[in-house]
């Protein structure tokens, strides 16, 4: 079994760490691998959930070296964090012999690449998408900004070195893998494809009674059509076509929109007005839920959306919410040009793929709502579980730890 140094700039006490990192670490430890974990924790989150993570790690024999995540001073804080990451990793390498450095995303991989020779370990670059291009396309590193341009060029150079120097690469999509195979920096390292998977034990299919109870809490009738949206409002997911679709469904069938997100009702309504698709408070229901509560709210939803702007970086996007919707038996509207979404929707028969996000596509989606809502949720869940169950991803990482020279793929090429 492998001895692994796992480095992530995300926090294990944050929602993403709880859902997308912690289960994999615990599963790998249960498979017999020995892990030392470096993560960056926000002080308030560490105070709330740190003891829970420590207890889980102690039970599984995982060593944890949490570091403080800094948010100020701007820009300088990130540099300080990177120095702290390098120091923590160097200290771990001095004290332990590792077979593998598992670096989650670019910042961690830069540290891993710098230390792999000293550690005598192989580097697993778990890239999580084309991060520099996501930052530029999302408006964080604008091309017209001197600082933005410098940061983009620096991290694209880091990216090339990471692709060239890693011993194993994990991508979220086959689309990203096929793209990397064409890069001059690619030197033949095995590339595994492990999409964002869902915890099908947590995201369970609701009973008819549970669905009725949740709708009562929302003050909605059992037969009211509900269009769902899961996740915070950000730069990746497109709200304009979602609002436009909701308005059409409202006008044709009295549908309501359910938003399970961090934003308030007023923020959702303000965003709808800004996008030229105004809604009234009666058109929507907005709930803020902890992760364990999300499945019960999804139990009220008939069909949900997963609309993302297609760009270069979207080749590497694997929406976590896709598997979570399907685990709850909820079919999905999605648009073409996003990672392996088109392939997965076809294999799972999990909803409707729109060619684009224009008005004609939104009209087509509205016309198909009743048909999608009538699909058998149990059959949908079963088909999706065979492809996107969390256990399959945990097993895939364990197989890489067992033999880093062999690629693993959960999505067919």
PLM regions and their residue ranges:
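Nucleotide-activated donor-binding/catalytic signature segment of Leloir-type glycosyltransferases, i.e.
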Residues: 261, 267-298, 303
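Nucleotide-sugar-dependent
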Residues: 15, 237, 287-297, 304-326, ...
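A short helix/loop element that forms part of the nucleotide-sugar donor recognition site in Leloir-type
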Residues: 49-56, 204-220, 377-378
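Conserved donor-binding/catalytic core segment of Leloir-type glycosyltransferases
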Residues: 5, 221-237, 242-246
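Carbohydrate-associated surface elements
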Residues: 175, 197
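Membrane-proximal helix-turn-helix segments that form the acceptor-binding/catalytic region
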Residues: 87-91, 110, 114-118, 131-133, ...
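N-terminal subdomain of nucleotide-sugar transferases
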Residues: 1-59, 244-252, 402, 408, ...
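A charged, aromatic-enriched C-terminal amphipathic alpha-helix characteristic of glycosyltransferases
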Residues: 356-364, 370-403
